């Protein structure tokens, strides 16, 4: 029970830390300048529920794990490769003047094996650096997703508020036009209005109703878009402020600092991608050089569990050089 509690607490803590780290992508302090708590609450819902943002976070976590896997290749690999087997009756074995008659025995081979590629050319370390650059690129993709989706939600949110107000105005215009038509009809009975005036007023009423229908369609479209961004199409209605309650407390700057362009995710991503390509070229070149692998075993090799001659230890270095692979490595270098 205690282990389950610790696991649950750790999971909640990790999720909270991830939420805190990614919340800055939404720039809540900026949106608070709109003095609209409903907008801020909806933006937090977008972060919690939007599927595209969840996918972006998962890709970032995946890229981070790939970096750790690449770093693991720089370290020695230690494993257990045991063997237990039985040699049954065999024919005589002759070694010069020595003859070993047929025999049967059981072998126990229980070593710890170690392999380590000596990174004398720095290739494995460069591969890890390349994966780190790719991780930074994916982080910029995640940042771009937060900026794009947050901005798209804010635009749809304020357009929906504006559309609500336009619908209200349009309904008021329709009511006034209907009153005007009734007035024309009364005047017509007294001979102070003509049928053409009534027809013109009714035609204008039809146009107004068509405009109202278009506004209602646009309102429905905006609601669907916002529901999609919120990550739940089951919302019956979208919480939003009234047009009269909007009160922006910030001013639009007259100019933008040119250095701000250097912080754009796409610009940072392009620079990181160029750096990654340069590293990959170095990796492809050093892949043409020989490798040196240190290998060793430490354990037991015996045919009798009670034998005193059972300790096994060996250590060696294996040079590996691919002399011919059909030109694959050269093509890989050109590809980079």
What residue ranges belong to the model's regions?
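Small/polar, glycine/serine/threonine/aspartate-rich low-complexity segments that form flexible
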Residues: 22-35, 82-113, 236-253, 259, ...
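Transmembrane beta-barrel architecture of outer-membrane proteins
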Residues: 39-41, 55, 107-111, 155, ...
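Sec/SRP-type N-terminal targeting helices
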Residues: 54-58, 71-72, 118-146, 196-200, ...
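Sec-dependent N-terminal signal peptides
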Residues: 4-13
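Periplasmic alpha-helical coiled-coil/stalk elements that build and connect Gram-negative outer-membrane
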Residues: 124, 133, 140-256
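Bacterial Sec-pathway N-terminal export signals of envelope proteins
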Residues: 18-68, 245-275, 322-323
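Membrane-embedded beta-strand positions of outer-membrane beta-barrel proteins
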Residues: 78-82, 270, 292-296
């Amino acid at each position: 029970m205690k282990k389950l509690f610790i696991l649950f607490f750790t999971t909640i803590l990790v999720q909270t830390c991830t939420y805190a780290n990614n919340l800055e992508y939404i720039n809540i302090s900026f949106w608070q300048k709109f003095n609209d708590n409903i907008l801020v609450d909806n933006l937090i819902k977008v972060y919690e529920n939007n599927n595209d943002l969840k996918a972006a976070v998962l890709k970032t976590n995946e890229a981070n794990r790939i970096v750790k896997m690449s770093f693991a290749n720089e370290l020695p690999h230690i494993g257990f490769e045991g063997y237990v087997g039985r040699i049954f009756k065999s024919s005589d074995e002759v070694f010069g003047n020595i003859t070993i008659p047929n025999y049967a025995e059981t072998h126990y081979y229980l070593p710890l094996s170690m392999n380590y590629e000596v990174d004398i050319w720095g290739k494995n370390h460069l591969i890890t650096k390349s994966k780190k650059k790719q991780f930074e690129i994916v982080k910029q993709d995640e940042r771009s997703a937060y900026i794009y989706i947050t901005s798209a939600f804010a635009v749809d949110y304020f357009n929906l508020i504006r559309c609500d107000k336009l619908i209200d105005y349009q309904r008021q215009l329709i009511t006034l036009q209907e009153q005007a038509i009734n007035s024309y009809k009364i005047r017509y009975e007294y001979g102070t209005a003509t049928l053409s005036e009534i027809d013109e007023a009714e035609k204008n009423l039809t146009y107004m109703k068509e405009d109202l229908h278009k506004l209602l369609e646009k309102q429905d479209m905006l609601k669907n878009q916002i529901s999609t961004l919120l990550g739940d199409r089951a919302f019956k209605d979208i919480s939003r402020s009234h047009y009269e309650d909007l009160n922006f407390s910030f001013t639009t700057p007259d100019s933008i600092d040119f250095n701000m362009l250097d912080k754009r995710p796409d610009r940072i991503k392009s620079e990181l991608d160029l750096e990654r390509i340069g590293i990959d070229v170095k990796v492809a070149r050093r892949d043409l050089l020989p490798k040196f692998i240190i290998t060793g075993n430490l354990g037991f090799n015996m045919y009798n569990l009670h034998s005193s001659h059972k300790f096994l230890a060996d250590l060696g270095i294996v040079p590996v050089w691919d002399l011919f692979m059909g030109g694959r490595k050269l093509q890989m270098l050109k590809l980079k």
